[in-house]
Amino acid sequence: MTQAWWRDACQPLDNAAMDQARARQQQLTKPAGSLGQLEALAIQLAGLQGLERPTLDQVAITIFAGDHGVVEEGISAYPQAVTGQMLCNFVGGGAAISVLARQLQASLDVVDLGTIDAQLELPGVRHLRLGTGTANFARQPAMTENQLQAALQAGRDSAQRGAEQGAQLFIGGEMGIGNTTAAAALASVLLGCPASELSGPGTGLDNAGVQHKAEVIERALRLHGLRAEDPLQVLGCVGGFEIAALVGAYIGCAQAGVAVLVDGFICSVAALVAVRLNPQCRAWLLFAHQGAEPGHKTLLAALQAEPLLALGLRLGEGSGAALAVPLLRLACALHGQMATFAEAAVADRPA
């Protein structure tokens, strides 16, 4: 392993398993291609798992949480105290992702990377405390070098825990008041797009609030003079603890050979950073949905991603990815359990 571990090689896809899965799809009792994207998903999962007939029984969900200093600029409709309160809700079973995890029989891990409440102690939460939230990136870099490295490593550790526990699919979620502002700032630099095209309502800003949010981002980017060619510096300067942890988790999963289902806008920004740092990890990323944040469509296009759902979601927490899990499971079930023409004694199409 190199010191910059995120540059280390990711696991290769199993091309032989993909070829076998592709051949199987041609023999199932249906017109070729008639299940559309579900067929491609089954074939991709075959390559990721190294199995002709992949399954998705073991799903690991990790929520990364952290507060954001840029909230001082009045860019959120909610107070920062909500971040810590939602951690309690996650482990208490009352949050959307908590309900979804139960329904999916998925594991749910909650990681506190640094909220404004330095004394917060909740059973069932991993408290790492890299700081009481990031610094206000409208005035100074969001993270120190040590904080950035620790956040990346926290994500990698979560990926490794998932792999050790036999996870076949990893979902990263996030919680942090102000994190759509950090995500929009990151995307603005990496995509070369004006912040006004990427800034949305987040947790419920009105039009004036969205405009103010974009202005705060533009002012911060002028202050820091960031370049897309240095994604790590961009992440440390305007990102968040939880976004950096997602980056580390996505790369860590690809290095460990665990498929990732990416959630919404913030998670897609983390995926973009991960791919810029290690392009090999892109093959391990599946994209769950196109959300309501205006910048999400632009991000997905930049990642050449085909989202599975479009439900107008903007909750975060990994909720959109969790909602897409049944679709992936059904794709695997159809691929693995449908009869072939020979097995069902059904006439195949003429050669």
Curated annotation (Swiss-Prot):
It catalyses: 5,6-dimethylbenzimidazole + nicotinate beta-D-ribonucleotide = alpha-ribazole 5'-phosphate + nicotinate + H(+). Disulfide bonds: none annotated. Pathway: Nucleoside biosynthesis; alpha-ribazole biosynthesis; alpha-ribazole from 5,6-dimethylbenzimidazole: step 1/2. Pfam families: DBI_PRT (PF02277). Coiled coil: none annotated. The keyword Glycosyltransferase applies. GO terms for molecular function: nicotinate-nucleotide-dimethylbenzimidazole phosphoribosyltransferase activity. InterPro entries: Nict_dMeBzImd_PRibTrfase (IPR003200), Nict_dMeBzImd_PRibTrfase_bact (IPR017846), Nict_dMeBzImd_PRibTrfase_N (IPR023195), Nict_dMeBzImd_PRibTrfase_sf (IPR036087). Catalyzes the synthesis of alpha-ribazole-5'-phosphate from nicotinate mononucleotide (NAMN) and 5,6-dimethylbenzimidazole (DMB). This is Nicotinate-nucleotide--dimethylbenzimidazole phosphoribosyltransferase. The lineage of its organism: Bacteria, Pseudomonadati, Pseudomonadota, Gammaproteobacteria, Pseudomonadales.
